[in-house]
Curated annotation (Swiss-Prot):
Domain ELM2: residue ranges: 785-876
Biased amino acid composition, Pro residues: 551-579
Compartmental location: Nucleus
SUBUNIT field: Interacts with CREBBP and EP300. Interacts with DNTTIP1 and DNTT.
Pfam families tied to this protein: ELM2, zf-C2H2_6
Phosphothreonine found at: 773, 960
Region (Disordered): 201-226, 270-317, 332-351, 390-500, 527-583, 601-629, 956-1016, 1043-1087
Gene Ontology molecular function: DNA binding; zinc ion binding
Ranges where the SANT domain occurs: 891-942
Biased composition (Basic and acidic residues): 976-990
Protein name, as recorded: Transcriptional-regulating factor 1
Function, as annotated: Binds DNA and activates transcription of CYP11A1. Interaction with CREBBP and EP300 results in a synergistic transcriptional activation of CYP11A1.
Length: 1205
């Protein structure tokens, strides 16, 4: 009764806490969004300590309930209460869970809630921790016995039984062992937070019971309640926390639990079929959470070890209970809150990691108690039966209970979980007594053992006990579980607790290992994609526990019992378990021990059949078909070295989980059965598949009756199965009838209404005959390889005939147009040619642009040449708008004014043939018109060249003045050079006209003037028909060599009178100002700033590079001249010096003096310039200029002109 009263007191504290739990817990469950974190923390802290059920917290701590809830770390206490009180975990949900859990579950939930609340919400004093440690040894044994005894009782006990259990627990708390039990219970509720998640799933109906007093007896409560509550706390983020807070108020808790259970059911799609295992992991989690909550501040003493242990426990719990994913924030808060109080306990757990395991097992039991409906919890467990689902993982743990639980207890994860659940008194007790640590391992093993469905979990004493006390952490994780992702079992929550952030981050060290090739992967999606390379089958991912994995094997339903034999301390055993399971190629199964935030891919493998919370969509979906958010992210705690090393790992922040793109199902090509390939060797190992396009049937009777019947066309069978799984035509039809995550044996034919046809052949290539008898409902198809013969496949080639037969054949082509016979007459052809020539002359406006118009006119005149000529001589006829050629544009018919032509020439000289810039300068014409004008002029120039050639008989050496491009070695007509700007532009516009006779062309200033050459200092060639102008005598001398190499007497004129140029003479191409092919006019029309005349010879270039190349010839000439001048000067000085000498020239003694005197003249020769050379006047032109240089000069000019054209 005393205990019961204490329990009631705790309930009062919890009731206050429950109220506060209803508020978002700021301290512990801030992440969970519950208020019980702050306000409850104070009350909860006091209540758990005072509660008789929580051995960790002395009853004087219960007295602390009176303290303001906000004053103490109530958030932590709430978490612990939730972990400790199955009903308290969620004010309504936990109470319902207790009621649903059965008497033992309720009992466990009640004591656990009280103590976990203390663990989670209160940073209980170290004295209480020490007390719990001292009591650990005896309490652990009692807890173990309680867990074993009350495992079944939890399933049976109802709300009334829960009350009795509370009383029993309070009575037990009176003694030292009772206090130890309380401590264990209080710690376990923290881990129960993890297990509470599973219990919440399974025990949702049980928790609705309003009173914890009616729950399980105290002994069962400590073992199961703590872990389940902690788990439930995680599952029911807000509701579970409230329920754990409401451990003192059973009535309020059931209501809240009911609501939370609904949430949990919604969230926890994957009920874990083995609630006991889940409870075991949850108990560990709850213990860790309680320790963390109690020792958030105390974690400092042994942070590395405790964190490592917490990670190990969290990993185990996460592997066992996926609920940790969702309640990660709560787990973090619980750990933080528990760690201060658990500060002393973590060392004990670190000392004996096995102790953590028992506590973890209690946490799992508490979770089960905390979880509202056991069946719901069981479903999550079933869902987590896969390696990826913590709940199923719990079931696996239960099956593996001995090896796995011991291993986990030995693993640092177990201590980490206990340390993270600072509430757990078992941690303290474990420190005090190693036997108690083993008890804890046993208890944890018991919760892990229940691989049963939710009902099976309830049947298990430990499992039910775990389920009864919905630890706030466990409940919270289940709140996260609604996301369809296992949280309690998630490595995030486990590692997150160790780090202070429960489920938020994944352990970067956690990796998944392919069970076939042992390749490591960082995430489940990556592993799933890799498994496609192994035949498209999904193997349960082997989670590589690198840092002392505590997570149970990730394998699906098969629970690796190899872990059971493994010693509890060695963390490595779990990985071996994973490979064995992984070896079994089952449809992608999530390992229960692997913390996963994922919807179970296969309900059967996860024990989903019993899961109520799991949505049907989640069950049906294959793992690969999940959305990116739903894709599981598996991280298994690595095998941890010594605890010290593992302590450092928990400190590391886990990398945030990454979203993985959905990957399509692997290509699955079903091999053709032997019945469909009777003689596969006939195709040299190739397999035959039935074509889905067509399957012509051969009816034997019809062939016998109608021998003339043609065989159906032979189509080679497809090399790949036309019904292979993929995104093709039949993919949806084939996949719809099969379960998710499984690669069904696809039929060889698609599900089409047509009957299946049997592929067979009467004979094969190798000569072997195979007789195939079609089965019932099957029809044979002739697939014997053959060449299809017939009119449909081959053309009949007629016999060769004589070529003369072609004359008899009538042309089958349609006659479109046939010319008149007269057009073939030569005389008529000549008339048409003459007409076109006339049209291109100056007789008609438009000149050469009239050729097309002339042909159109001739067509309209129906071939009458005279009528066409009359039409052309008259004004342009006005065509009707309906005329086909009314809007036709004849090339060259545009009107260009003198200003436009001038601008065009200037732009063409500046930008060459970049007509976009040319048009910008002309502005009044379009780019198309500028292009047309340029090429029309080019065409006219060629025509004009021909006409000039015919008219050049009266002119000696007359050559057409074409563009430098075509003028190459020809000299431009001086008449063209002397044309006025207007005449030249008009010629460009109307170039079709033959150029007027040279005699008619008025003589104007030479192009050099137009170019802008200086009037003075010009040297003009006096040769007949030349008149080339040069700026220097050397240039003129070089030019004179063209006229026979004789020296020409050059005249220097200030101005070159136009009359001195002979009309008929041709101007040298070198002197021609019109070096640009674009100009038919004098260079005077061009902008002087855009031309580059040569200062030596007067040649004009439109590109600086062309002039620079040309100047090299002058430099070479000048260099030769300088050398010759130097020689001449040196010779003259030598002669003068010799004459001045007194002695004989050849006197040896004077030679040195002579040499010295000659040094200065030699130096003077070096500075001689062109003027000095010219003054010497002793050099012949032939000596100064070489023929090869002149040729080079010509070539350079011509090339320059060509490039511009």
């Amino acid at each position: 009764m005393g205990d019961q009263q204490l329990y009631k007191t705790n309930h009062v504290g919890h009731g206050g806490e429950n109220l506060f739990y209803q508020q978002p817990p700021l301290g512990v469950h801030s992440g969970l969004g519950h208020s019980y974190g702050n306000t409850i923390s104070g009350a909860g802290m006091d209540a758990p300590q005072a509660s008789p059920i929580s051995p960790h917290f002395p009853q004087d701590t219960r007295d602390g309930l009176g303290l303001p809830i906000g004053s103490k770390n109530l958030g932590q206490m709430d978490t612990s209460r939730q972990g400790g009180w199955g009903s308290h975990a969620g004010p309504g949900n936990h109470v319902q869970l207790r009621s649903n859990l059965a008497n033992s579950n309720m009992m466990w939930g009640t004591p656990t809630q009280v103590e976990p609340a203390d663990g989670y919400q209160y940073t209980y004093s170290q004295a209480s921790e020490i007390r719990t440690q001292k009591l650990t040894s005896g309490v652990l044994h009692k807890l173990d016995s309680f867990t074993q005894v009350f495992a079944n009782q939890n399933l049976r006990i109802q709300v009334n039984n829960m009350a009795q259990v509370l009383h029993t627990q309070s009575a037990v708390m009176d003694g030292a062992s009772d206090s130890a039990l309380r401590q264990l219970l209080s710690q376990k509720p923290v881990e129960p937070s993890a297990s509470a998640i599973a219990s919440r799933y399974q025990q949702v109906p049980q928790q609705p019971h309003p009173g914890f007093t009616g729950g399980l007896p105290k002994p069962a409560l400590p073992v199961g309640q703590h872990a389940p509550q902690g788990h439930l706390y995680y599952d029911y983020q807000q509701p579970l926390a409230q329920m754990s807070m409401q451990g003192g108020q059973p009535l309020q808790a059931p209501q809240v639990l009911s609501g939370h259970m609904q949430q949990l059911q919604q969230h926890q799609y994957y009920p874990q079929p083995p609630p006991q295992q889940q409870q075991a992991g949850l108990q560990r989690i709850s213990v860790q959470e309680m320790q963390q909550q109690q020792q958030p501040q105390q974690i400092r003493p042994s942070p590395p070890q405790q964190q490592q242990q917490l990670q190990l426990q969290q990993r185990q719990s996460s592997l066992q209970i996926p609920q940790y994913y969702q309640p990660q924030p709560m787990m973090q808060h619980l750990q933080e809150q528990q760690q201060p109080s658990m500060h002393l306990q973590p060392p004990s757990y670190h000392r004996d990691p096995h102790q953590y395991t028992p506590e973890q097992a209690h946490a799992v039991q508490l979770i089960q108690l905390g979880s509202m409906p056991q069946y719901y919890y069981q479903e999550p467990q079933q869902a987590y039966s896969h390696p990826l689902y913590p709940q199923s993982h719990l079931s696996q743990h239960q099956q593996r209970e001995d090896g796995q639980l011991k291993t986990y207890s030995s693993d640092r994860q177990t201590p980490a979980m206990l340390s993270s659940h600072g509430d757990m008194g078992t941690s303290d007790t474990g420190v005090a007594d190693p036997a108690s640590s083993e008890m804890t391992r046993v208890t944890s093993t018991l919760p892990h053992q229940p691989l049963l469905s939710p009902s099976g979990i309830h049947l298990n004493n430990m499992g039910s006990q775990h389920q009864q006390p919905p630890s706030p952490s466990a409940m919270w994780p289940q709140m996260h579980l609604p996301d369809g992702r296992a949280q309690s079992g998630s490595p995030e929550s486990s590692s997150g607790q160790t780090k202070g952030v429960f489920g938020e981050q994944f352990d970067a060290k956690n990796k998944l290992t392919c069970s076939i090739c042992l390749k490591e992967f960082k995430s489940l999606p990556a592993l799933n994609g890799h498994m496609r390379s192994h035949g498209g089958m999904r193997a349960s991912p082997s989670l590589k526990q690198e840092e002392g994995e505590k997570a149970p094997p990730p394998q699906p339903q098969p629970q690796p019992q190899p872990q059971q034999p493994l010693p509890p301390p060695p963390p490595p055993p779990p990985p071996p378990q994973l490979p064995p399971e992984a070896e079994r190629l089952t449809p992608m199964v999530m390992p229960v021990s692997v913390p996963v935030k994922l919807i179970p891919p296969k309900p059967s493998s996860q024990g989903f059949t019993n899961s109520v919370a799991a949505t049907p969509a989640a069950r049906d979906k294959p793992a690969s078909s999940m959305s990116d958010d739903e894709m599981p992210v598996l991280e298994i705690p690595r095998k941890h070295p010594p605890i010290a090393a593992k302590v450092e790992e928990p400190l590391k922040n886990l990398p945030e989980k990454k979203k993985f793109r959905h990957r399509p199902e692997p290509l699955f090509i079903p091999p053709p059965p032997s019945s469909y390939t009777p003689n596969p060797t006939s195709y040299s190992g190739a397999t035959l598949y039935q074509s889905q396009l067509r399957s012509p049937r051969i009816l034997g009777d019809h062939l016998l009756l109608d021998p003339a019947h043609e065989l159906p066309p032979y189509t080679p069978p497809p090399m790949l199965s036309p019904v292979r799984q993929g995104s093709g035509l039949f993919s949806n039809v084939l996949i719809s009838g099969h379960g998710p995550g499984v690669h069904p044996q696809l039929p060889l034919t698609p599900l089409t209404p047509t009957p299946r046809v049997l592929l067979c052949r009467s004979s094969s290539i190798d000569g072997s005959n195979v007789t195939v008898t079609p089965g019932p409902g099957e029809q044979t198809v002739d697939v014997e390889p053959r060449i299809n013969i017939g009119l449909r496949f081959q053309a009949e080639i007629p016999e060769l005939q004589d070529v003369s037969a072609l004359a008899q054949d009538t042309h089958r082509a349609t006659l479109v147009w046939k010319p008149w016979p007269e057009l073939e007459n030569q005389a008529l052809q000549q008339q048409v040619e003459n007409l076109l020539n006339l049209c291109c002359s100056s007789a008609l406006p438009g000149g050469g642009t009239n050729s097309e118009f002339a042909l159109h006119s001739l067509f309209e005149a129906k071939g009458d040449v005279m009528a066409t000529l009359e039409m052309l001589l008259l004004r342009k006829p006005v065509r009707l708008k309906c005329h086909p050629l009314a809007n036709y544009h004849y090339a060259g018919s545009d009107k260009w004014t003198s200003l436009e032509r001038k601008l065009f020439n200037k732009a063409l000289a500046t930008y060459s043939k970049d007509f976009i810039f040319v048009q910008k300068m002309v502005k009044s014409k379009t780019v198309a018109q500028c292009v047309e004008y340029y090429y029309t002029w080019k065409k006219i120039m060629r025509l004009g060249r021909k006409h000039r050639t015919r008219l050049a008989e009266i002119i000696d050496d007359c050559m057409t003045s074409e563009e430098e491009e075509e003028a190459e070695e020809e000299e431009e007509d001086p008449e063209e050079d002397r044309k006025s700007i207007k005449e030249e532009e008009s010629e460009v516009a109307k170039s079709p006209e033959p150029p007027p006779a040279p005699a008619l062309a008025p003589t104007e200033g030479p192009p050099m003037q137009a170019v802008g050459q200086q009037p003075s200092g010009n040297f003009i060639c006096e040769m007949p028909n030349c008149g080339a102008v040069f700026s220097s005598r050397q240039a003129l001398n070089g030019h004179a060599r063209i006229h026979g190499g004789t020296n020409q007497v050059a005249k220097t004129r200030g101005a070159i009178p136009s009359g001195k140029q002979k009309p008929g003479g041709t101007q040298s191409g070198y002197c021609s100002v019109k070096s640009s092919p674009s100009h038919s006019t004098t260079s005077g029309e061009t902008d002087p700033t855009t031309i580059f005349p040569c200062k030596e010879c007067g040649k004009v270039f439109f590109k600086i590079k062309s002039r620079n190349a040309h100047m090299k010839t002058h430099r070479q000439q000048e260099e030769q001249q300088r050398q010759k001048a130097q020689k001449a000067a040196f010779a003259a000085e030598m002669a003068a010096t010799i004459e001045r000498t007194t002695g004989p020239v050849g006197a040896p003694e004077l030679l040195p003096l002579d040499q010295l005197s000659l040094m200065k003249p030699v130096k003077d020769v070096d500075i001689l310039d062109d003027d000095v050379v010219q003054q010497l006047g002793v050099m012949d032109e032939a000596e100064v200029v070489g023929t090869d240089l002149l040729l080079d000069d010509q070539d350079s000019v011509l090339l320059q002109g060509d490039t511009e054209l």
